[in-house]
Amino acid sequence: MTRLRDILLLALGLGRAVAGTANNTPAQTFKQCQKKTTDPLNGCPPGTIYVSQADKRARFQTIQSAISSLPNDNTSHVILIAPGIYTEQLNVTRQGPLTLLGTSDRPFRGESYADIDHDVVHENDVQIYWNSANHDAIFPDNVYTSVLTIGPNLNATLTGSGPTGFPVPDDTPFGCTDFRVYNIDFRNEYAPYANGPAHAIGVSRANAGFYSCGFYSWQDTVYIGKLGNAYFYDTVVAGQTDFLYGFGTLFIQSSTLSLRNCGGGITAWKGTNTTFTNKYGVYISDSQLLAANSSVAPVIVDKCSLGRPWNALHRSLYMNTYFDPSVLPAGYTQWAGRPDGNFGANTTMAVYKVYGPGYDEVAEEASDVTAVLTENAAKPYLRPVDVFMTPEGKQPNIKWIDASIKFPSRHLKR
């Protein structure tokens, strides 16, 4: 009866998750710089570059022109972006630290972005659009569709094909060591349904943190390439098919996964054999899985797979996360049409302390695909410090994560 009630509430648009997103405190590091004032650079670090499509005080009218003006060295730079809708593709290849700030009063007011019940119209003041999809393989690789790509060069960012993807040369350098974005939405709205890979962002051979950002597409929304490390905090990620996929390491904290429909799975990862014990995979912690709106909610009840293995070394884990009724009772699924479903002894598709009307522990355990972990089994993956590594496999590797985030002690130990 409780599950029926939750389904009816969602259909009426009245459902509300009880996950921690409602109590998120956004990153505070740049709140004075991001705040809307008559002097846009008031409170900003010295040397901050200002981008605006209309303000004559701005040095650049496009974001990419500001990025391209920076030297490819180890110096740190900050770019402040005025409110507006920007239609452009962004490409970051430099190694030095770079921060993109969306003008917003949210951080100053302490308002969460991932709490999707907070606003009637949920969006940041800075929107970046690039509508493109690799439908019928019209591009040589999925990376060409991305709104934002972070990586040292083209080869490093390619997805490729086959069980190991594109063979990135061993001598490829590492890209940006500390890339950060605050209060910006990345939207690839090529079609209102999954119509081929359509990246909102891609991160390869780089460390990237995203705070109070939105990522909107339908298929393959977020791509984390080889040796890519990405940390999402207080974000919204929207998609339908395999919308978290890749080879690297992605940790999503206190965020909302917005289910626009169901197809394939939410996660799809290709693990890699290394000489060290790696932690490549996708980890979703203290977050919520919700139908995107009241129209789709009753249509996708019990239909959304938590993920499917892109190869047999797939690793994904949902921790302390709320499931609405959209989630498939069995949890994960094998990859239909692939030998052995890409599922084997080294495949990790797991949950730990998840809850909500979409969580069915009996069905998940009976599936023989979804693993319900004990505390000891989950312990190696619970915090960012547990999973992020250098390319050589050394830990800790979290200096690039914003230190203003207030975590329970179990999440981030510096």
Task: Please give the residue ranges for each predicted region.
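Sequence-level preference for short, compositionally simple segments enriched
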Residues: 20-53, 58-414
